[in-house]
Amino acid sequence: MADAWKDLASGTVGGAAQLVVGHPFDTIKVKLQSQPTPAPGQLPRYTGAIDAVKQTVASEGTKGLYKGMGAPLATVAAFNAVLFTVRGQMEGLLRSEAGVPLTISQQFVAGAGAGFAVSFLACPTELIKCRLQAQGALAGASTTSSVVAAVKYGGPMDVARHVLRSEGGARGLFKGLFPTFAREVPGNATMFAAYEAFKRFLAGGSDTSSLGQGSLIMAGGVAGASFWGIVYPTDVVKSVLQVDDYKNPRYTGSMDAFRKILKSEGVKGLYKGFGPAMARSVPANAACFLAYEMTRSSLG
């Protein structure tokens, strides 16, 4: 139980560090993912990541890059407590004897279990965040574009109240749960396995206790990049479902969204916002893992 509390505290600190560093990149990613497909002959609202940054800062100021941070900030303790605590508990179940490091394949399984558990928190949190981040990109969409364009949200609680009142109650907050599973389970499995594998590569063996902060930063960056490298299309599907109009939906489900994106935009449509996501993943996850390791070490 003592280890669980240490994982909880360390995960909370790591998650806060990740959020502060990575949220502006995430805002741009969601804006690019959720902007409506332009009519033939017209340009999209944002021509790329840099253009999205310029337009966001011009219309909303720098604070626009941090729009929607209240939702993940309010739940960062619970989110990372679940992620790192479940991972720690699964490590205990998988470990053959006390003090023996897990194999990389066992780290993969532990990460998958943590990803499954955290999906139940990630889905409603990210639905709220995506609605807030995307409303600027959707504001110019026509009422026939089947996106949530008319609703203007005042903040995270306003989104939650609207969904609970007008979109099927609590079930509405879990819109996009399937693609959230499809992202979090393989993504976290790969991320934790890659993190441990790279640490062992740098240490030259399974004892990684002597690694310095620079090595932990590199390992965290590699881990973050590996997460997005394998699951990014599922994140695009999740985002478009979560900002889709409840009354006049464009998509009937995850597979329908996948097929329609592929048909209308090609494979590149499944990688909208990939640049900002990868640019975010390296520093944000480096900050997360470094903060986690330092806090965990200080707790003994």
UniProtKB/Swiss-Prot annotation:
Return one Gene Ontology term, BP aspect. Answer: mitochondrial transport
Where does each Solcar repeat begin and end?
2-93, 102-201, 211-298
GO CC entries: chloroplast; mitochondrial inner membrane; mitochondrion; plastid
The record's subcellular location field reads: Mitochondrion inner membrane
Q: Which SUPFAM superfamilies match?
A: Mitochondrial carrier
Q: Where are the transmembrane segments?
A: 8-28, 64-84, 108-128, 176-195, 211-231, 273-292
Which keywords does this Swiss-Prot/TrEMBL entry list? Membrane, Mitochondrion, Mitochondrion inner membrane, Repeat, Transmembrane, Transmembrane helix, Transport
> What does induction of this protein depend on?
Up-regulated by light and down-regulated by norflurazon and lincomycin. Low expression in the dark.
- Tissue-level expression: High expression in cotyledons, leaves, flowers and developing siliques. Lower expression in roots and maturing siliques. Not detected in meristematic tissues.
Using the UniProt record, give the first listed, main subcellular location. Answer: mitochondrion
Superkingdom as given in the UniProt entry = Eukaryota
Pfam families assigned to the protein according to its UniProt record, in alphabetical order: Mito_carr
The protein's topology relative to the membrane is: Multi-pass membrane protein
KO phenotype (gene knockout): Chlorotic leaves and impaired growth when grown under ambient air, but normal growth under CO(2)-enriched air.
**Family, per entry:** Belongs to the mitochondrial carrier (TC 2.A.29) family.
**Its biological function?**
Involved in photorespiratory metabolism. Acts probably as a carrier for a glycine decarboxylase (GDC) cofactor or, alternatively, may act as a mitochondrial glycine shuttle. Involved in the transition from the embryonic stage to the juvenile autotrophic stage.
Descriptive protein name: Mitochondrial carnitine/acylcarnitine carrier-like protein
- Source species of the chain: Arabidopsis thaliana
What gene is this protein a product of? BOU
